UniProtKB/Swiss-Prot annotation:
Modification(s) after translation: Autophosphorylated. Each AtoS molecule may phosphorylate its partner within the dimer rather than phosphorylating itself.
Phosphohistidine modifications at: 398
Record membrane topology: Multi-pass membrane protein
Cytoplasmic side: 1-15, 211-608
One Pfam short name: HisKA
Source organism: Escherichia coli (strain K12)
Subunit structure: Homodimer.
Identification of the protein by name: Signal transduction histidine-protein kinase AtoS
Impact after mutating residue 565 to A: Cannot bind ATP and is unable to autophosphorylate
Keyword Cell inner membrane: yes
Domain PAC: 326-382
Length: 608
C-alpha cells in the first residue's frame, strides 16, 4: 500500500501538487507543443512573405534600367549596371538587416549586384551554376522559394523573374541564412519553454503558498523588517487577521522614518551653504544644489567619483580629506578652493560621519562662498584709502606745490643769469624733475578729487585719431607700426571727450612701453551692440602675467620702475562713470588687448 501515498496522498499540500500535475502540467505541455509546432510554421511563412516583399520592392525599383548601357562590352556593362543598381539593393538590405539581395542579368549571364556589398561585392560578375534554381525561375517565368545551399551558403531564397514586355531579362533574389531563421525559431522555442516553465513554477508556488499560509505571512513580515533596515521606503502588504495588525504597525513606523528622512533631505537640498559628503574611499556620495552653484560642478559629474579629482593638478590641501584620513575636524576655516572656472574663497567646516554603531563611514564638508564678501571688504578698504588720500592730497597741494613753485622760479632765474653750458644743463634737469613732481601731484589730485564731466557728442573715430597724433612721435613711429581699423558707420556717442582721450592716451602709452624693440599696435572701433560701441587697443609686446591682470586696475599698482600706478585705475573710473566696461585679455609674451565698451547714450551724467 506504500504506492497509494503517491496515487492519493493524505496531506492537502501533496493533494494540491498532484492536482497541479493533472490539471496544469499536462495541458500546459500539450499546448506548448502545439504552439511550438505552429510557431515554427508561422516563422517560416513570415520569412517567405518578407523575402517576397523585398524582391517585389527591388522589381519596382528596377524599372527599365536593364535597357541601359546596351552598347558597352560585357564587363563594362556589368560594372555600369552595378554602379546604377547597387544603391537600390544597398538601401533595401539596410532597411532589412540580415537579408541578402541582388539582380541577375540573363543576357550577361552574370550577377549584377549582391548586397550588402561589404560582404558579397566579390560575387558581382559571377555566373550561376547550370543547376542553380535561378535558371529554373528564368526558364519557367515562375517565382520560386528555395531552401538549400547556394552562393551565400545555406539560405532560404525567394526568387522572382524579371519580365519586361513579355521577355525574361533575368531574376531578382532576396535570401536569409537558414541559420538565422533557425536561431529565431530557437529563440521562440526558448520563450515558449520559459513561459511554460514559469507557468508551472508559478502554479506550484501558489499551491505551496496556500498550503503554508501562516508561515508565509510570518516570513513576509520578517523579510520586510530585514529590508526596512536598508531601504526605508519598503512597505509591507496588508495581511489578514492579527498579522495584518503587525504589518500595519511596521508600515506606520516606516512612514515616520520616511518623513524624518525626507525632512533632512529637504533641509540639505534647500540649504544656502554647499554640502558635500564622501565615503571611506574618498568618493562623493552627496552634493546639494548650493554646492553645484558654488563649485561650478554638476551633481552627476561628481557623485561616485573621487573627490580628489577636483584638484589633482593643484597644490590644494583638502580639509575634508584631512578629516577623513586623520580625523581632524575644521570649523569656519577660510581657504581658496580651485573651482571649475575660478578660485573661490570659502569658509569650510568639516566633520566625520558615523553609523549607528559608531563606526566612521565618511566625512562631510559644509562651506559658504566668501568671494563676494572678500571683494566687498577689499573695495571698502580701497575706498577708505582713497578717502584718506583725498584728504592728504589737499594738504599736499599746498604744502608741497607752493615750495616747488618757489624753487622753480629761483631755478629759472639762475638759468637766465648763467651762461655756463654745464650749469644750464644741470638747471634744465632740475626744472624737468620739478615738473615731474608737479605732474605726479596733479595725477593724485585728479584721482582723489571728484570732477564734473563735460558731456557732449563725441565721435570715437575722431577721438582715436586725435589721440594717435599725441602718441606718434618720431621716436615711437620708428619702432612701432600703428594700424587703425575704424568703423566709418559709427554714430557719435554722448561722452566726456577729454576724459576718454585721457583713457586712450594712458592705454596707448602703456602699449608703446610694453614693446621693447619693433612691434605694432592695432586700434579698432566697431558697433558692439545696438546701444554700445567698442574700442580695442592691441599690442604685441611683453603681455601681462595672469596673476597680475586682476591687480592692474588697483590704485598705485605698477610693474614699471617709474610711474604712479594711477593711469589704469583712473581709466577704469572714467569708463565706469560712462556706464561702460574696460576689459583686458593677455598672455605673457603674446601682447595684450584692452577693450573699452561704451554706451551710446548713458543714463544720467556721472561725476568722475
Amino acid at each position: 500500500m506504500h504506492y497509494m501515498k503517491w496515487i492519493y496522498p493524505r496531506r492537502l499540500r501533496n493533494q494540491m501538487i498532484l492536482m497541479a500535475i493533472l490539471m496544469v502540467i499536462v495541458p500546459t505541455l500539450t499546448i506548448g507543443y502545439i504552439v511550438e509546432t505552429e510557431g515554427r510554421s508561422a516563422v517560416l511563412s513570415e520569412k517567405e512573405k518578407k523575402l517576397s516583399a523585398v524582391v517585389n520592392l527591388l522589381n519596382q525599383a528596377l524599372g527599365d534600367r536593364y535597357d541601359l548601357y546596351i552598347d558597352l562590352p560585357r564587363e563594362e556593362r556589368i560594372r555600369a549596371l552595378n554602379a546604377e543598381l547597387a544603391p537600390i539593393t544597398e538601401n533595401i538590405t539596410h532597411a532589412f538587416p540580415g537579408i541578402g539581395a541582388g539582380y541577375y542579368n540573363k543576357m550577361l549571364d552574370a550577377i549584377i549586384t549582391y548586397a550588402p556589398s561589404a560582404l558579397y561585392q566579390n560575387n558581382v560578375g559571377v555566373t550561376i551554376a547550370a543547376d542553380h534554381p535561378g535558371r529554373e525561375v528564368m526558364r519557367t517565368n515562375t517565382p520560386l522559394v528555395y531552401s538549400g545551399r547556394q552562393v551565400r551558403g545555406d539560405i532560404l531564397n525567394s526568387m522572382l523573374p524579371i519580365e519586361r514586355n513579355g521577355e525574361i531579362l533575368g531574376y531578382i533574389w532576396a535570401n536569409e541564412l537558414t541559420e538565422d531563421i533557425r536561431r529565431q525559431a530557437w529563440k521562440m522555442d526558448v520563450r515558449i519553454i520559459i513561459v511554460l516553465t514559469a507557468g508551472l513554477l508559478i502554479s506550484l508556488l501558489l499551491i505551496v503558498l496556500f498550503s503554508r499560509r501562516l508561515s508565509a505571512n510570518i516570513d513576509i513580515i520578517t523579510d520586510g523588517l530585514s529590508t526596512l533596515a536598508q531601504n526605508i521606503p519598503t512597505r509591507l502588504p496588508q495581511l489578514p487577521g492579527e498579522m495584518g495588525q503587525i504589518s500595519q504597525s511596521v508600515n506606520n513606523l516606516a512612514q515616520a522614518l520616511r518623513e524624518t528622512r525626507t525632512l533632512n533631505d529637504l533641509i540639505i537640498e534647500n540649504a544656502a551653504d554647499g554640502v558635500i559628503a564622501i565615503d571611506r574611499q574618498g568618493d562623493v556620495t552627496t552634493m546639494n544644489p548650493a554646492a553645484e552653484v558654488i563649485t561650478g560642478y554638476q551633481r552627476h559629474e561628481l557623485v561616485g567619483q573621487p573627490y580628489s579629482m577636483l584638484f589633482d593638478n593643484t597644490q590644494f590641501y583638502s580639509p575634508v580629506l584631512d578629516t577623513l584620513e586623520h580625523g581632524t575636524e575644521h570649523v569656519a576655516l577660510e581657504i581658496s578652493f580651485p573651482g571649475r572656472d575660478r578660485t573661490i574663497e570659502l569658509s569650510v567646516t568639516t566633520s566625520r560621519i558615523h553609523n549607528t554603531h559608531g563606526e566612521m563611514i565618511g566625512a562631510l564638508v559644509i562651506f559658504s562662498d566668501l568671494t563676494a564678501r572678500k571683494e566687498t571688504q577689499r573695495r571698502m578698504a580701497q575706498a577708505e584709502r582713497l578717502a584718506t588720500l583725498g584728504e592728504l592730497m589737499a594738504g599736499v597741494a599746498h604744502e608741497v606745490r607752493n615750495p616747488l613753485t618757489a624753487i622753480r622760479g629761483y631755478v629759472q632765474i639762475l638759468r637766465q643769469q648763467t651762461s655756463d653750458p654745464i650749469h644750464q644743463e644741470y638747471l634744465s634737469v632740475v626744472l624737468k624733475e620739478i615738473d615731474s613732481i608737479n605732474k605726479v601731484i596733479q595725477q593724485l589730485l585728479e584721482f582723489s578729487r571728484p570732477r564734473h564731466s563735460q558731456w557732449q557728442q563725441v565721435s570715437l573715430n575722431a577721438l582715436v585719431e586725435e589721440t594717435l597724433v599725441l602718441v606718434q612721435t618720431a621716436g615711437v613711429q620708428a619702432r612701432v607700426d600703428f594700424i587703425s581699423e575704424l568703423d566709418n558707420e559709427l554714430s557719435p556717442i554722448n561722452a566726456d571727450r577729454e576724459l576718454l582721450k585721457q583713457v586712450l592716451l594712458n592705454i596707448l602709452i602703456n602699449a608703446v612701453q610694453a614693446i621693447s624693440a619693433r612691434g605694432k599696435i592695432r586700434i579698432q572701433t566697431w558697433q558692439y551692440s545696438d546701444s554700445q560701441q567698442a574700442i580695442s587697443i592691441e599690442d604685441n609686446g611683453c603681455g601681462i602675467d595672469l596673476s597680475l591682470q586682476k591687480k592692474i586696475f588697483d590704485p598705485f599698482f605698477t610693474t614699471k620702475a617709474s610711474g604712479t600706478g594711477l593711469g589704469l585705475a583712473l581709466s577704469q573710473r572714467i569708463i565706469n562713470a560712462h556706464q561702460g566696461d574696460i576689459r583686458v585679455a593677455s598672455l605673457p609674451g603674446y601682447g595684450a588687448t584692452f577693450t573699452l565698451i561704451l554706451p551710446i547714450n548713458p543714463q544720467g551724467n556721472q561725476t568722475v
